[in-house]
Every structure is written in C-alpha cells, then in structure tokens.
Amino acid sequence: MKYFVVALALVAAFACIAESKPAESEHELAEVEEENELADLEDAVWLEHLADLSDLEEARGFFGNTWKKIKGKADKIMLKKAVKIMVKKEGIFKEEAQAKVDAMSKKQIRLYLLKYYGKKALQKASEKL
C-alpha cells in the first residue's frame, strides 16, 4: 500500500513536469519588460533567469518520455491489481474479472482502485481507534 501511494505521488510529480508550459522566448520577455516597466534589479534578475530556462527544454523532453514509460507501467499494474481485487472481492473467475476490467476506461479503473484502497484505509483507521 505504501509503495502504491509513493508510486502515485511520483506519477503526479512527473505529470506536473511533463505538462508544464515551455519557457518564454527573449522577445516575449522583452515585451513583458516593456509592459511592466521593470526597473527593479530583482525583476531584471528574474527575467534573466527566465531567459536561461530555454536550456531546460531538453530536460523537459527527457522527463516527458520517462513520464510516458512510467505511466504505461503504472497503467499495467493498475489493470492487474483491479483484476486481483475483483477476483477476491466478487468471487469470480480471473477471465471474467479481466473482461470486466477491459470494458472499463482508465478513469473508471483508477476510481475503482481508489475506492477500494480508501475503504481499506478507513477500516484500518477505525480499528486503531
């Protein structure tokens, strides 16, 4: 359970990195500077920092590819986990559970797993009280 939560947190972090907006170009930065009339030294340093962010485009591409690989593996793990839970919970054969999971969308599978683990965590918490 702990590993699943950590993996989910990593997936969310990679999603944020992969979906972040590309850095602004120098031309756009100059327009922003003119519009805001930046005279303060801190603002100028901030704009220089933004201009240097174009180097991070390569890193963003790397994380984007890594994110896709991790997401694919996470989806496969979620499918297997959903099938196991259905077999255990509903008492049906693995083939039937696999057919049910295949008919579900990825969003439905995630919701199913979150509901299952949420109920399980709530039961454990209530037992401790």
Swiss-Prot record:
Residues excised as propeptide: 21-60
Entry GO MF terms: toxin activity
Highest taxon of the lineage: Eukaryota
Gene Ontology biological-process annotations: defense response to bacterium; killing of cells of another organism
Keyword Signal listed: yes
Pfam families named in the record: Latarcin
Signal peptide: 1-20
Disulfides per UniProt: none
TM annotation in the entry: none
Family of this protein: Belongs to the cationic peptide 06 (cytoinsectotoxin) family.
Identification of the protein by name: M-zodatoxin-Lt8i
Organism per entry: Lachesana tarabaevi (Spider)
Lineage per the UniProt record: Eukaryota, Metazoa, Ecdysozoa, Arthropoda, Chelicerata
Gene name in the database record: cit 1-6
